[in-house]
């Protein structure tokens, strides 16, 4: 998992040749912290096929307006420069362990769907 800043956002996310899953978070958000370990495990599972990243909205508040982020954690998927907010389930189900399997299912069915055909 990489840390994205406004300085490297364009290069790391928008210009990426591989799909990116970006978590918008803040240091004081316990749910965001819980997703860090999920993102690390997902990165290990999928390797170089996907880029998992996080951006701290406290350090980069401008990003909230750019992507119309209302709260954290928010997860967006970027493919070929296009952004889509991930329609993940509401807490607490998502954060009680269900989240990791949901993200794997999403990655497999939406991001790598052509690889399975």
Annotated model-derived regions:
Residues 9:
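Substrate-binding pocket helix/loop in short-chain dehydrogenase/reductase
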Residues 67-79:
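Structural micro-motif
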Residues 77-117:
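Non-catalytic, surface beta->alpha helical segment in thiol-disulfide oxidoreductase systems
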Residues 34, 66-68, 93-94, 110:
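Chalcogenol-based redox active-site neighborhoods
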Residues 29-32:
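Short cysteine clusters
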Residues 2-5, 24, 36-43, 47-62:
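Thiol-based oxidoreductase modules, predominantly thioredoxin-like and allied folds used
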Residues 15-27:
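Short active-site neighborhood of thiol/selenol oxidoreductases, capturing the structured segment around
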């Amino acid at each position: 998992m990489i840390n994205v800043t406004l300085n490297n956002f364009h290069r790391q996310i928008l210009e990426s040749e591989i799909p990116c899953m970006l978590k918008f978070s803040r240091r004081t958000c316990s749910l965001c912290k819980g997703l860090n370990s999920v993102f690390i495990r997902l990165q290990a599972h999928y390797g170089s096929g996907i880029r998992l990243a996080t951006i701290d909205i406290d350090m980069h508040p401008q990003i909230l307006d750019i992507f119309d982020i209302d709260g954290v954690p928010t997860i967006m998927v970027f493919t070929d420069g296009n952004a889509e907010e991930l329609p993940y389930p509401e807490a607490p189900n998502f954060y009680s362990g269900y989240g990791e399997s949901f993200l794997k299912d999403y990655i497999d069915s939406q991001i790598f769907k052509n690889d399975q055909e």
